[in-house]
């Protein structure tokens, strides 16, 4: 594995263990060139998935991009990083087991919205503001009002 610090080609695995949910192997590595330590994760990939964007472009599904989007929505919120990891894993599994090799970006966004709704209402509204492309404050007010009403009803 190439070192992210010095780009040396070889590193030595110092420790391996499964993640809490068992969906990945966490490996601590040490670069044989500069001695820096870093962590890698090994996950099963059932098949390569393609995300179809709204403008028709196609991108290879990128789990780190999914996790980053969820993390940005949850920034400065009392959400445990392990819960973000579990949500990303659940969405990835749902996509991989769907039976399709291509999935619309809107479907992925909907899955994230559903997951964030159960995780944290503020993160849910933050993600929705980007996903649904809110243009003005009234869009926020209307959406937040609907979320608040749903919370009282449910």
Swiss-Prot record:
Keywords: ATP-binding, DNA-binding, Metal-binding, Nucleotide-binding, Repressor, Transcription, Transcription regulation, Zinc, Zinc-finger. Pfam families: ATP-cone (PF03477), Zn_ribbon_NrdR (PF22811). GO terms for molecular function: ATP binding; DNA binding; zinc ion binding. One of its GO terms (biological process) is negative regulation of DNA-templated transcription. Binds 1 zinc ion. Residues 49-139 form the ATP-cone domain. Residues 1-22 are annotated as: Disordered. Its cofactor is Zn(2+). Transmembrane segments: none annotated. InterPro entries: ATP-cone_dom, NrdR-like_N, RNR_NrdR-like. A zinc finger (unnamed) spans 3-34. Residues 7-22 have a biased composition (Basic and acidic residues). The keyword DNA-binding applies. Negatively regulates transcription of bacterial ribonucleotide reductase nrd genes and operons by binding to NrdR-boxes. Belongs to the NrdR family. This is Transcriptional repressor NrdR.
